[in-house]
Amino acid sequence: MAKTPIPFTTLNDLPDVILSNIIAAVSDTRSRNATALVCHKWLVLERSTRTSLTLRGNIRDLFMLPTCFRSITYLDLSLISPWGHPLLASRATDAPDNDSALIAHLLRHTFPSVTSLTLYARDPNTIQFLPAQWAHTLKHIKLVRWHQRAQLASGDELNLLFIGTPQITSLDLSNFYCWTDDVPPALQSNPNVACNLTRFNLLNASFPEGFKTDEIKVITKCCPNLKEFKVACMFDPRYIGFIGDEALVCLATNCPKLSVLHLADTSVLSNCRGDPNDEGFTVEDAQFSVSTLIEVFSGLSLLEELVFDVCNNVRDSGPALEILKTKCPKLRSLKLGQFHGISMPIESKLDGVALCQGLLSLSIRSVGDLDDMGLIGIGRGCSRLTKFEIECCKKITMRGMRTLASLLRKSLVDVTISCCKNLGASSSLKALEPIQDRIQRLHIDCVWDTVEEFENLDGVEYGFDLNEASGGEASSNPAGFGDTFGSMDDDLMNNRNKRCKYSYDLNSVYVENNGHGNGFCGRTWDRLQYLSLWIGVGELLTPLAAAGLQDCPKLEEIKIKVEGDCRLWSKPSERAFGLSTLIQYPKLVKMHLDCGDIIGYAHTAPSGQMDLSLWERFYLMGIRHLNLRELDYWPPQDRDVNQRSLSLPAAGLLQECVTLRKLFIHGTAHEHFMMFLLRIPNLRDVQLREDYYPAPENDMSTEMRADSLSRFEVALNRRQICD
């Protein structure tokens, strides 16, 4: 008798409710798109469960507005083409015209459940009428604007927003060009909206001076229920109204529910590279005391994330940071700028930030007195760190950084080393060898040093067993942490300047001399997925592999930032920058090439100089060898004429990268240069974005005209894509 065949069961046989929950749990956009291609049933379920959507079409093509995403709660309208142009037509009257009203109505009808909205708001008309379409459901709004502010009275734009969206609890103005004077009046005029706010982001690089004491007092008084507050401040005591003791105490008193607090000086937000030779101390000290910091931290017991990034000395901050351990037990992320005395262990005792044993992320910048032993103290105390950033710390050497990496070998996966005099590319990579099989994200500076330089470094012997670094005497307390260095020799800590033979051969990856080898071998960065590089103008990328990054089998994304004044160079030393060397990374598909901080001559250069078009050719030469799918490119700029435009050589070289599917140019381009890009066979998405301050206002130039961009998009969408 023949056996009855067992029916083959597939995922599609699951009940629709269960299958719908499975698909709803998928968050990655590309994975959801692939899910929708399986069959019609999965397509319907994917569309009905998608909650996040970014629209990229042209606003004039309303017939293409998708109507199947009825469950969208997060809607991003900041990238609609043509980028940066008003979404709703501007009028002198208080009411939108018919076209604008139709656009707003269709968006609300298509996406009825929006609770979070991101919007490019170039004019007040858009701010007033579009968010108001979801007045009863909208909770979070992010406004984006890189163009100049409209000529209105202080606070008028935000007042229009608050009147139309009375239910919002979260407001993000971090990329919205406005004045600090706009915020306090709008909050005072709408006390109910201000009282409802729980998240407020004012970390805006466009503020020339940041918020001052009186403004901070008004904002925090109007918003007592804030749980997340990020703000650009003025800490420089040379300015009237600088942030000092009064403002900090007022903040902690008025907003005791804060779990996320970011206080950053406006000069930090510009992301300009510091001077590696700087000692880390400024002429002026910040005008708030350690006792004030202790009072503030004591009043914010719910803190989970703290950024205190100032540009003036905060001296002897160790005792205040020790308070964080007991007063802010939930603290997991900490960033400090210009704080001194954060880790100065004496007689084997940990102190300062090293006692914050619950930290998962730590970032430090311009700590003038931090040396290798202080860094090792941090590694001993903060043994759970998964992310570590260090910037502008002149006294740190490769030996201290390597010891820290060894101590945190089991947890550390994200590292940034920037602008440290003794940590160039090779020394940084050598220091990170203990975690090279675990690290996933990395930033280094492409300052090409050599191994021979390491051997001449002054230092001490950190002669303790790194295999026991997370245990030993330091783990004697019930929590598994301690306040001492444990197995480290006390004499070593008493004599911080003692010199003796280093404990491992710098030409080997083993630690053998003291019998405490940890077996770090090989040169493969097995899990590295993201790499960020800083490089000075005129320098070459070709030594990257020789520095220690020759084998990165899983590297998918790279960001290269080039900075400097090319007017100081007659020409580069080689014909090409070295992008072709990146072909050794087989999975590299996404690149950010940021030449936006290169300064040069956009037009005719003086005799003996190269204009920016030739520099663009230098940096893009060889890009055709890479199998990139997505590229973000920032052209170099001429600040004298506020021009950041794609040149003819750049357009010609970009068209040779035939694998590209997405190309975003953060600048302007002539229409006929853009037409070169149509020769890329699989290119699906191209956009010009002037997302820098100040964005050009002249919309009549061929680089900016909306009709020019629309003609290119029509030609792009008219092509047949092979897949």
From Swiss-Prot:
Record bears the keyword Lyase = no
- GO BP, one example? SCF-dependent proteasomal ubiquitin-dependent protein catabolic process
Q: Name the SUPFAM superfamilies on file.
A: RNI-like
Q: Which residues form a coiled coil?
A: none
Q: Could you tell me in which tissues this protein is expressed?
A: Mainly expressed in fully expanded leaves, lateral roots, axillary and shoot apex, and, to a lower extent, in internodes and nodes.
Please state the protein's primary subcellular location: nucleus
UniProt KW Membrane keyword = no
Q: Sorted alphabetically, which keywords does the UniProt record give? A: Cytoplasm, Nucleus, Ubl conjugation pathway
Out of the domains of life, which is the source?
Eukaryota
The GO cellular component terms are: cytoplasm; nucleus; SCF ubiquitin ligase complex
Subcellular location per UniProt equals: Nucleus; Cytoplasm
The residue ranges of the F-box domain are 2-55
Quote any Pfam family the record assigns. Answer: F-box_5
What does the function comment of this entry state? Component of SCF(ASK-cullin-F-box) E3 ubiquitin ligase complexes, which may mediate the ubiquitination and subsequent proteasomal degradation of target proteins. Is necessary for responses to strigolactones and may be involved in the ubiquitin-mediated degradation of specific proteins that activate axillary growth. Targets probably SMAX1A to degradation upon the formation of an E3 SCF ubiquitin ligase complex (ASK-cullin-F-box) containing MAX2B and KAI2IA in response to (-)-germacrene D in the stigma.
Whom does it interact with, and what assembly results? Part of a putative SCF (SKP1/Cullin/F-box) ubiquitin ligase complex. Interacts with KAI2IA in the presence of (-)-germacrene D.
Q: What protein name does the entry list? A: F-box protein MAX2 homolog B
Its source organism is Petunia hybrida (Petunia)
Q: Which gene encodes it?
A: MAX2B
